[in-house]
Amino acid sequence: MALIQTSLIWVAYAVAIAILLAIASIFVFLYQKPRDRAASVTVVCIFTTLALLATVLLIPVDVALVSSTSRSSLGQKKDWATPDKVHGIVRTLEIVYYTLYSLDALLCLIVVPFTYFWYEEYDEDAAEHGEQTAGQRIWGAFKYTIAFLVFVVTIFLIGFFVPFAKQAKDDKRLDLDYFKHLLSENHGERALAFALGLLMTVGTVLFVLYTGAGMAMLPVAMIKSAPYVSNPTLAANTASQLEANRERQRQLEGRNEGRDGGLDARDRRELESLIREERTLIRRERLAAESSGEDRHWIVKTWIKIEAVFRPLKLVGGLLLIVVALVIFASMLITGIDKAKNSICGAHCGYILGHINIFQPLNWVLVKSSKVFPIDYVLFLLLVLFFFSASVVGIATAGIRFLWLTLFKIRKGHTSPQAMLMATVLLTLIVLGINYSVAMVVAPQYATFGPQTYCDLSTNSRDETPDCSEHKDLIKPCSELAKNPSAQDVCTPSVLSTFINRVTINFPFFGVVLFWSQFAFLGVYLIVFVTTLFRVPKIDQDQVDRDLEEEEEEGLLASTGRRFNATWQDITGRSKQTYGATESRNGEHS
């Protein structure tokens, strides 16, 4: 029975990985520029996105596996859950976590930078004339990658050794053996804890800036983007109007052929107006082609069809996401206040909370649903995808910046390969920030013990197992502060919570920054949410030719019935003959 249960948990994780592969592919193909698509960049971005999402979605697997060793209804360990069995489960999870974190680090520090420099090294003219070989590109990318890696490792070593060097100097033990002991201590787990804490802290800063803003903008953007005229109809109407426009231009030019004075004032004004209208129609034609997925990958075309199906639900979905965002906001605020007020050790250990003292809605929902796997897995998957989507929206809105300088812009169908790689690295770091936030703030009880309980009944001897079958009121949720010795035998904390607690205890600075950053996240969300409700974003004048579709789509809006008809046309790919505008235009120029 135990083997079946654990196998089903891992099967659910495998199914989630397959879903994540589709999501990662949609994200990459939807945002990258089709004309500049490079196979190496596409594969690296998809695989890196898949790895980072797989890392954060290991949390419910972690919770389900450690919780499967106990009976929450009785607060006892199951008969098969011997210490060796439990240790085996924990050890397996540790190996998977180390593998995924190492893979994320390998991708961010070596693979993605190498791919970035490989793409930058390409010289089209030199390649056409045979002056640049693949070996030269590889060597150039390799040199820059090594330089980047040396820079990162140097920062890591300085950050890791300087505090301990000061401590060793104070203790008059400044020798090489002391530093060897630091690296060998707990098989290097302290060094790994520092590396994880450093990356998690950097990721949390990005999480505050990008995800905090994106979580506020995502629902509002869905609400404000009302259903518009279908892409097939837009293409048909535009083609008809463009043909009529050019025919009228030919008539004007033909009428004035051979005339000495050229066009008269009235015809000249009309021709200039037609030329301006032609440019607008050409932009609109390009918009229709891009929106319908013309010349795009089949994944993008499929996604456009799916969007068309759910387009009528955008308003409802946006309102629902606002409710979800506000519940997350309230849950994080409650946990933050609880930790600040009731932490067992305060800033000395990163504000670890022994047990929840204030009712927290999101944590309660996940704990209750975790009793019936995989309900909690589905809810957690949706929660992670919401954070991920919010991060993407935040990056797409703000762009990739250094201080006030915009280095890259992230736009659907217009993102360069270099920008895609940079965005992927940012998302990887942000997911590490999401890891901390979900496990320690959003749902701390769920991410630590899940639905595990223990029997708080006194026994005559240490070896005797307490029985609460007749005392249900003594069955209590597992907690780090439980004083009953039986709690230590029954309660098994998740591997991730152990990792994070190890980081915050060994390196309190990381714990303080990670904790107070959650309040900064809430502040950014609140400011952007209120601002977004009352202020419409301005269009970048430098990208009018590319972004004009928003104004044009709004100008083509019609009745509600027409909007739902547009949805059906997008699904089928067929359009009606006219919408009236074409008829009037044809009649005007006939």
UniProtKB/Swiss-Prot annotation:
Its main location: membrane. The chain crosses the membrane at residues 9-29, 41-61, 95-115, 145-165, 191-211, 315-335, 347-367, 378-398, 422-442, 509-529. Belongs to the LIMR family. LMBRD1 subfamily. It comes from Phaeosphaeria nodorum (strain SN15 / ATCC MYA-4574 / FGSC 10173). Pfam families: LMBR1. It comes from the Eukaryota. This is Probable lysosomal cobalamin transporter. InterPro entries: LMBD1_LysCbl_Transport, LMBR1-like_membr_prot. One of its GO terms (molecular function) is cobalamin binding. Probable lysosomal cobalamin transporter. Required to export cobalamin from lysosomes allowing its conversion to cofactors. It is found in: Lysosome membrane. One of its GO terms (biological process) is protein localization to vacuole. It is a multi-pass membrane protein. GO terms for cellular component: vacuolar membrane. Keywords: Cobalamin, Cobalt, Glycoprotein, Lysosome, Membrane, Transmembrane, Transmembrane helix, Transport. Glycans are attached at N565.
